[in-house]
């Protein structure tokens, strides 16, 4: 379980991570299994060692930074709508439960921060790299183009003016 983390509100597209599209009128504990924070067939069943570091809520999706004591670094997981790739899983298929953003597992430095906005998400690593994904049709991801990205893309913030 995510200790102390609960979600409530509009459950459309699974944004609450509760396993359904139902709204939650009161704070409801998010059930989490080891599958939410690992990659492999052996990942199943509850993992009481998982700890939530941060939660970021977008318009119809949620991004979570998780720490699993059996892994060397924190992991990013997401749930909800992925109509523009805002979950970072490489497809437009939404999710009803948290699943890891696999493209971030190979970062050279651990992810230390996350954020979620309207149909977009981001992660920052300990070495200052920024990764963005989701809706980008107006260039709002800072990737140098005007298209959506379905997986995290590193953005060079040194190009940004002061």
What is each of the regions a protein language model found here?
Residues 1-162:
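Eukaryote-biased RCC1-like beta-propeller repeat architecture
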């Amino acid at each position: 379980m995510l200790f102390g983390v609960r979600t409530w509100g509009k459950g459309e597209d699974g944004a609450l991570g509760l396993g359904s599209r139902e709204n939650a009128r009161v704070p409801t504990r998010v059930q989490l299994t080891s599958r939410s924070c690992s990659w492999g067939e052996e990942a199943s069943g509850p993992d009481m060692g998982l700890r939530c570091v941060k939660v970021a809520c977008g318009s119809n999706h949620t991004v979570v930074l998780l720490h699993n004591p059996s892994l060397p670094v924190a992991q990013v997981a997401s749930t909800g709508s992925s109509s523009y790739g805002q979950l970072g899983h490489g497809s437009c298929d939404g999710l009803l439960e948290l699943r890891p953003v696999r493209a971030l597992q190979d970062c050279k430095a651990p992810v230390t921060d996350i954020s979620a906005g309207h149909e977009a998400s981001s992660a920052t690593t300990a070495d200052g790299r920024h990764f963005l994904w989701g809706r980008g049709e107006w260039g709002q991801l800072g990737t140098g183009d005007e298209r959506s990205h379905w997986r995290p893309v590193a953005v060079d913030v040194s190009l940004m003016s002061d």
